[in-house]
Structures are given as structure tokens and as C-alpha cells.
Amino acid sequence: MAQEKKKRIVTWDDPMPGAAAAREMGGLPFLRAILAGEQPPPPIGELMGFEPLEVEEGRALFVCTPAEYHYNPIGAVHGGLACTLLDSAMGCAVHTMLPAGVGYTTVELKVSFLRPITLKTGRLLCEGTIIYLGSRIATAEARLLDTSGKLYGHATTTCMILRNLAPEQPKPSVGE
């Protein structure tokens, strides 16, 4: 007898107005606006089931509670969840330091997975902190812990700083 399939419905806001606001605001005010509900959260958080908890200059803290839909074929949470949490926390730590009109993108990511994450792990906290901020490159690190402080993974990143971000323009249709 086949088991009934489980389902999960994911909803999100159009990300383009938020992306435009991110270009117009400094990184820290923009991230604080997300926390205050004044800007919508990015779709990746809605999809993966995590959210920012705190932001301050050079630091970002995310929270996630692993669920069945995070599982891989061998009965543990897929490493992609931890990797995405770590990348998000580090990227946002960098973003807190950037003025309006300046963005970033991850160019290198090194992740160390230390132990399996399961439903029994419970709530996870992921804290990213900036290590270095230059005019073209930033580096950051992050740690993924449970609520008792047990370390599940850590990472470092190198981000490219993107200056003079222009608002995204619609692409013309063929024949225009």
C-alpha cells in the first residue's frame, strides 16, 4: 500500500521591489526593514524555511528549524540547507556594511559540515560576521549551532563588492 504524498505550499512576494529598495537603501537599513516587516523577505528564505533574527553592523543572525522537506535520501537534512544558511548569514553580514547603491555577490564559499542535522536537532542559529571589507572584496565567516551551542558547521566566504548598481531595466521585446 502506497503512502499518501505529503505536500508543502510555498508563497513569496515579488522580489523585484525589494531588490530595488536594496539598491536605494544602505545594507543595514534595508535588512532592518526586512526584520521590521517594512520590506518583504527574500524568496529563498520562504523556500528553505529560514529567516533573519538580528542584524547589526558587521553581523547577521538567522534561524531555522529543520523539517522533513529538508531531508536527503539517507535520512538527514541535506547539506544544501546548512550551506544556504551559512551563505545567507555571511552575505548579510557583508551587506550590513555597504552603503546605498553598493551590492555584493559570493565568489567563493568554503563549508565544513561537522555532524548530521536531523529533526531531533531542533532550532538552528546561524551567525555570520564580517572579517574584512575592502573596496572590491569582503570576507566573512559563519557558524551554525543548535540552541545549546553545539556546532554543526562553519564556513568562510569571499564576496565581490559591486559598485554603482543601476536599477534593473525591463528587457525590450524582440522586434522593438
Regions found by a protein language model. Give the residues of each.
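Terminal targeting signals and extreme-terminal segments of soluble enzymes
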Residues: M1-E176
